[in-house]
A protein has these predicted regions:
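Residues in soluble alpha-helical coiled-coils and helical-bundle/repeat scaffolds
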Residues: 50-54, 72, 89, 93
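HTH DNA-binding helix-turn interface
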Residues: 2-4, 22-26, 39-40, 46-57
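Residues in the helix-turn-helix
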Residues: 30, 44, 94
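Append "Primarily bacterial transcriptional regulators
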Residues: 32-37, 45, 88
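Alpha-helical structural segments
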Residues: 11-19, 23, 37, 54-73, ...
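Basic, helix-initiating cap at the start of DNA-binding domains
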Residues: 1-24, 28, 33
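Helical hydrophobic small-molecule/effector-binding pocket
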Residues: 75-99
Length: 99
């Protein structure tokens, strides 16, 4: 599988988890629910992530941390934090219930 295909599936699984988390606590969400919503089979999930918590970590790293990495490397911590908090605010329902 190409890196682009892998990222597309990762993103699809992430969106599924985010939608499900808004409706119920992450502890109660099953891998089957995530894969059903994403339209993939369970083995596909496990080819990408060990569990839903690794998927959650991927979401945080991809959506909040990686975009600000250049800012942090250049000592622009204040700007990085503003962007991180704006991202959390944008999806506050998800981040509130995912914690």
């Amino acid at each position: 599988m190409t890196n682009q295909g892998r990222n597309a599936i990762d993103t699809l699984l992430a969106e599924s988890l985010k939608e499900l988390t808004i409706k119920q606590p992450i502890e109660k969400i099953t891998i089957k629910e995530i894969t059903d919503k994403a339209g993939v089979i369970r083995p596909t999930f496990y080819n990408h992530f060990q569990d839903k918590y690794e998927l959650l970590e991927w979401i945080i790293r991809t959506e909040l941390l990686e975009p600000v990495k250049p800012l942090i490397q250049n000592g622009m911590i204040d700007q990085a934090l503003i962007i991180i908090f704006a991202g959390i605010e944008k999806e506050k329902d998800f981040y509130t219930k995912a914690s």
